[in-house]
């Protein structure tokens, strides 16, 4: 969806990618059963779907990294200049903060191993989110609305425009503003940060050391600089997607497919259907034309996450059922997104934003629009506490504490706690229960489901949202929410009571 990553964290369930992709994984229970001996029909079914998945992978081209044609002003390593802000990571979050802090006249150094590389991620956003940030020119395709297929014969039309982010345009726009504002760049990885009373020293893999008043970790899910002090056990959203040229597809080109939970494509694959009934996946699709489309099979959230191989097999079966013949794949992506889990230590010396700061929506996996909207909050706090002469005494730990406080105020922490409660319920739902949940969810007034997906509802409205969802749910779904949500609800209430400013 909008937070897709090609370079995930090191996860025990993650299978090596294309070129060395392990098609029959020895620790996959499904394939173990095949080797131990099952009926010949089952072996043929397995062989059929695996060969379909393999055929799909055979169309994936060699990865070509594309760089933007910019002359980046480099950080002068010979001068040992102390910068106001050192940003580790050149993704959307890092560049957004760099752009806004430098606009206020502060010195900024952006550190990234590939600062001109076009982001590999496919980002999808609601158009109103980018419109609010004056970024409509960074959408290359928009759809008048979206559709959700809950089940065969149950379809929800969502009259909320959706867009695909033009990665090249967004990064070009941000880089140009950074260059104009005087941001300096250093091409390297960061291995460590050493803190002193007033400043910090960023240690790079090439031996360069950069001193800064504030260090911002915008590296995504690496969690290498920002510290955590609680067990990290998130749910995982896992997906496999392709931008493909096809003979045709059955979807309306004026609407994107937000979720397709139908499973008729698995009728011929009982093993896959059984697994999908327990931990379901859905199709997310952005049709650009009648013969070009982005297709992605997604596990919304699971713990542990589904294996990439499993998702690719389900996708191959779905495309075959839909009659979608893939002629050529322009690019593919394998996505692993940690969701939920604890927030980092608040406060701490290194400031974070985006995935490293726990900003992924725990119930949906959304992050891009939320992070870009948070960039001005972080930037304004840094400028306010660092750039004003009256704040000269505010340095080091005190300065970072104020920035963290602005990024994660109590109302945002309470909001996130509610979203984690939602994730904990989703983790317990099988396919039928998931369908019932989203059948009720998308029947809510648009204000509520819009606000939930875009992180615009805060605790008072979230309580109304929860009651409204419960009232729209079927009796079966209400019973499921009550029985499976009791422990997560108690956990949420306990965390809310303990969390005070």
From Swiss-Prot:
Known catalytic reactions: a carotenoid psi-end group = a carotenoid beta-end derivative
Keyword NAD: yes
Keyword Zinc found: no
Disulfide bonds: none
Transit peptide (first-last residue): 1-48
Pathway in which the depicted protein is active: Carotenoid biosynthesis; beta-carotene biosynthesis; Carotenoid biosynthesis; beta-zeacarotene biosynthesis
Domain of life, per lineage: Eukaryota
A GO biological process held by the record: carotenoid biosynthetic process
Keywords on record: Acetylation, Carotenoid biosynthesis, Chloroplast, Isomerase, NAD, Plastid, Stress response, Transit peptide
GO annotations of cellular component type: chloroplast
Record-listed E.C. numbers: 5.5.1.19
Binding-site residues for NAD(+), renumbered to this chain: 85-113
PTM sites of type N-acetylvaline: 49
Cell location: Plastid, Chloroplast
GO molecular function: lycopene beta cyclase activity; oxidoreductase activity, acting on paired donors, with incorporation or reduction of molecular oxygen
NCBIfam families xrefs: carotene-cycl
PANTHER family for this protein: OS02G0190600 PROTEIN (PTHR39757:SF5), PTHR39757
Described purpose of this protein according to its UniProt entry: Involved in carotenoid biosynthesis. Catalyzes the double cyclization reaction which converts lycopene to beta-carotene and neurosporene to beta-zeacarotene. Major lycopene beta-cyclase that does not seem to be involved in neoxanthin synthesis. Involved in salt tolerance improvement by increasing synthesis of carotenoids, which impairs reactive oxygen species (ROS) and protects the photosynthetic system under salt stress.
Family: Belongs to the lycopene cyclase family.
Additional record remark: Plants overexpressing LYC1 exhibit improved tolerance to salt stress.
UniProt name for this protein: Lycopene beta cyclase, chloroplastic
Species, as recorded: Arabidopsis thaliana (Mouse-ear cress)
Originating gene: LCY1
